[in-house]
Amino acid sequence: MRDVQSEKDHRNIPINMVGIKGLKYPIIVMDRTNKRQHTIGTFNLFVDLPKDFRGTHMSRFVEVLDRHNMKVTPKNMESILDDMREALKATVAHVTVDFPYFIRKNAPISGIGSYSSYNCGFISTKNKEFDFILKVEVPVLTVCPCSKEISDRGAHNQRAMVNVQVRMNSLVWIEEIIEMVEDAASAPIFTLLKREDEKFITEVSYDNPRFVEDVSREVVLRFMNDPRISWYRVEVSSQESIHNHEAYACIEKGKSL
Amino acid sequence: MRDVQSEKDHRNIPINMVGIKGLKYPIIVMDRTNKRQHTIGTFNLFVDLPKDFRGTHMSRFVEVLDRHNMKVTPKNMESILDDMREALKATVAHVTVDFPYFIRKNAPISGIGSYSSYNCGFISTKNKEFDFILKVEVPVLTVCPCSKEISDRGAHNQRAMVNVQVRMNSLVWIEEIIEMVEDAASAPIFTLLKREDEKFITEVSYDNPRFVEDVSREVVLRFMNDPRISWYRVEVSSQESIHNHEAYACIEKGKSL
Amino acid sequence: MRDVQSEKDHRNIPINMVGIKGLKYPIIVMDRTNKRQHTIGTFNLFVDLPKDFRGTHMSRFVEVLDRHNMKVTPKNMESILDDMREALKATVAHVTVDFPYFIRKNAPISGIGSYSSYNCGFISTKNKEFDFILKVEVPVLTVCPCSKEISDRGAHNQRAMVNVQVRMNSLVWIEEIIEMVEDAASAPIFTLLKREDEKFITEVSYDNPRFVEDVSREVVLRFMNDPRISWYRVEVSSQESIHNHEAYACIEKGKSL
Amino acid sequence: MRDVQSEKDHRNIPINMVGIKGLKYPIIVMDRTNKRQHTIGTFNLFVDLPKDFRGTHMSRFVEVLDRHNMKVTPKNMESILDDMREALKATVAHVTVDFPYFIRKNAPISGIGSYSSYNCGFISTKNKEFDFILKVEVPVLTVCPCSKEISDRGAHNQRAMVNVQVRMNSLVWIEEIIEMVEDAASAPIFTLLKREDEKFITEVSYDNPRFVEDVSREVVLRFMNDPRISWYRVEVSSQESIHNHEAYACIEKGKSL
């Protein structure tokens, strides 16, 4: 059968990224407590395509991924990228994967356990060097400092999503990132809280009011002081309870205006 | 050209609903203040198909809709349904449309104006009789009564979405539904609030703590006492600030367990 | 601490459903090939609330779910529902759960294996009796019979999503539902296809053109003839390649116009 | 009342972007045929925040936007950005807005008219200079060249989304971008097609098979040859009818590997 993709292209235009997008695949990721966790990845797998070829070979992306037995670790990502470059005769390879990650947490006073879900992901590229970014989304509670200050009673508060991306010099567990982010908010949130826990979270959060600006800076302070973290991007989106839109703040290391 | 759709089907299975889904079309709806409002509808247009025919004629759904000059009112919906039944030789026709609707609201103390957006919709059917349901989604603020009661200071609160559906004996404006729902919550929410407004909303909501159960019942009380409303379904989903899931309550008129 | 939820409510309005929504939790479901499959559930857990009580106890829903060790089978669902009714002193309990489910499939000619992902779910209720519905979403290929008939060459085709719900007299595997649905379409689809497989799927689908009406009827024919299936609802949504909207057909057993 | 936001911050960390996100507002955009089109914008409005201030003033973003009477043109965007910088004492301002845009198109043979919807947007920044990017998403039809070549009959095809971003030296209408993109695909798609139109589109597309790689290159060829376009990014995502994931290609001007 003719290999249409391998035919010469005369338009003289290289393609930056080509491949498959939105592929769901079962994966196994590292878990600090249980060593391994089964979860579900949503993958984008891309390579570059030189100007001389008409198309890439889409089926090979799946073959490479499938060959790695579902293991998705930083080390494994580099191996997937190398295999993609070889299988597709490419110079650069890109793999991103998003996955839900579960942690068993105990309520702060009652100690009762339950699972909390975090949207995590990896962004990786291999050209000459291997680049790897860890993404973690942490839901937290933010109490508005302005509302607390100007009101005779109460203070508006809400769930906020903190999206962090980090490059690392050495391993930082997802669990550690979550702890740092929760520590930077008005209070952490939980799947299961009994009444005594709810009282505690309500009071702690009221005592620690935080704007989205505060949360982003507090996370950055913690990341700056961790020598394992070489780069970070921190975004905070607060689902304002008094509005139907979000408040947002973003700090990226090394980015000027 | 052969009309494959009109060919006889021998499988002896009537189809309950067939047509097109997810069609975006510019529309004009009634506006209490400005008479008319331009907005964007997302339509589902379905009819039944008797067991004897292989297929419906999809293009006619668009032709019927387009012929009505974008006007979407209760009266107009019935006319669209009648035209669909005729154009497609059907017994029953169904049209649902969802659209964002904007209202200019003034902040409670400063009086400054801004637009608020509400997801609205119509669900309509014509068999022998014409059935019409108005849908309105109203974002509100809910302060947790339990959290307030058990805590020495503060109370967790959050944005909650109140989804109501009503059948009417006579016209009820979208604006009236929104006012009834906002009145049933801890406080209304706004796109633009200056500091004095934020203080007001914070204190008012703290003085009116409401569970999702309370909000649903308070809305129902208002609907029960409005003779124009003959049927209702009220759903409240609160984006709990202390959890990463929603609290939910639903009351439907005439529904037992 | 005061139990605000248990206080008497004087509004005299029972609530049909109250509980938690959108809770993500790790689960284990039955797998025809491997006995068990780890996946991720998104849960809604509701009970009724009599007119005399102000609120339900939201934390107990999570406690009940957590106590079942993540197992989600039809039998286990009934046990969760019973526990919810007891823990929350309710008459009726409702649990819905949606989850991705993976099946290893071999390409039709090359035989190469890969995982395919299917969105599945359970809808269950316990009042006096236990009611259980299995949901499966199957992506398939549909070639338009009209386009093929009237065109001198080619025929437009596209991915279509077939959403089925079934009530069962005895166990039907998710895998069996998928096979019946794929058999009813122009062709099944795969995550990984080599060139010889792509040729096969292209030709097979061209030889079996199917409207959404055809697919829905063909699925129903297979379900009618399976004594294990006591009720079904079949929806087909075709992501029309020549339009930016969907074609849709729906057949529900026992539903008249 | 105390202005908490204006207080001095001692953490010494400037914030790259702070403001509001996901704000829906009614807007009026330019329309080549009808001069003006009412539509609905979803806005992100951000500024930078120097290290010395604790917070920005969120309400002023809405005030600035509201003051511009809903007009959203390139010229107007610069004015919004300037007003944001002044109102918030910022150095840089960012505004992005996404909106649906409708065009009346006539079917290729029958000539019957209907509206097609396109997701469009603007990305604008003002620091010392004003930067403006136009985004347009164009759904098209792609027939797979490989499938056509290797199969004895038929060829798999599908809806593909072409997302383009352009910077301009002088005005390029959204309508012109759409025409260039449709011309680069196997065939354009329409909301309403009668049988003779469907035959035409089926045959034209079969005669013009295009990979995602082909479509991206063909769009780039057209953009390279238009002196009004100074920069482009072209992404093509094809909703593969034989898979449950997308095929993807991306070319960005000036980007190396």
UniProtKB/Swiss-Prot annotation, chains A, B, C, D:
Pfam family, one: GCHY-1
EC identifiers of the protein: 3.5.4.16
GO molecular function terms listed in the Swiss-Prot or TrEMBL record: GTP cyclohydrolase I activity
Record pathway: Cofactor biosynthesis; 7,8-dihydroneopterin triphosphate biosynthesis; 7,8-dihydroneopterin triphosphate from GTP: step 1/1
Keyword Hydrolase: yes
Annotated site location: May be catalytically important: 144
Reaction(s) catalysed (UniProt annotation): GTP + H2O = 7,8-dihydroneopterin 3'-triphosphate + formate + H(+)
Enzyme class, first EC level, given as a word: hydrolase
GO biological process terms held by the UniProt record: tetrahydrofolate biosynthetic process
Keywords linked to the UniProt accession: Hydrolase
InterPro entries: GTP_cyclohydrolase_FolE2, GTP_cyclohydrolase_FolE2/MptA
The keyword Hydrolase appears for this protein: yes
Functional note: Converts GTP to 7,8-dihydroneopterin triphosphate.
Family classification: Belongs to the GTP cyclohydrolase IV family.
Name of the protein this chain belongs to: GTP cyclohydrolase FolE2
Source lineage: Bacteria, Thermotogati, Thermotogota, Thermotogae, Kosmotogales
